[in-house]
Amino acid sequence: MNGEVALPTMRAILDELRVERDAFLAALDDADPALLTAPGLVGEWSARELLAHMGYWTGHAAEALHRAEQGVLHEFGSDDPDFDVDAVNETVARVARETDLATVRLREEAAYGALVERLAAADDSWLLDTTGYRETLEQVLREDGPEHYREHTIDLRAWFTGDAEATDDDDLDDEAREDEARA
């Protein structure tokens, strides 16, 4: 290596997203179906609420890309200065509790599909552009995409296996996957 740092690419984020979502869905598929709507996975959320949560934030990342396509990423987040992540998460969970699991799955799948489509067509030069709340597009895409799926895959595996504590080994595995996805 010549000491140069590789610039991030949409392709690398897309590849990482695919890997992490596949791991998330595999963890979900490994679960006893009776547990998918039982509360207690993340706080009072069931897997259904968690899946809706993933769909919402994946859609959030797709919306950030849409704003970048339009040349107005700087407005993303500035239109709601009182944005409350916890309130949004609670609203998403409440709606999910009132929705059947199949519909929640379809909504997450649609949000994921929209993000994949936008990532595949996006310009790498947008990654360093900033949003209205001062994060780069890359930060939004990673936090709402692959990093978010990874975080909640650990939650799923821990809850469904009865291991309430995520281990340091899980964190090391995460770092190795991140390095591999970036390579």
Regions inferred by a protein language model and the residue ranges of each:
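Short, contiguous pre-domain boundary segments
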Residues: 2-9, 91-97
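Solvent-exposed interaction patches of small proteins and small membrane subunits
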Residues: 4-15, 70-76, 103, 140
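Short capping loops/turns at secondary-structure boundaries
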Residues: 6, 97, 101-108, 138, ...
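Short amphipathic alpha-helical segments with heptad-repeat character
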Residues: 11-18, 51, 55, 102-105, ...
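A generic structural signal for well-ordered alpha-helical segments enriched in polar/charged residues
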Residues: 22-26, 30, 110-117, 121, ...
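Short, contiguous alpha-helical
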Residues: 37-86, 124-183
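Alpha-helical bundle segments that constitute or directly flank the non-heme di-iron/ferroxidase center
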Residues: 3-33, 56, 60-67, 147-150
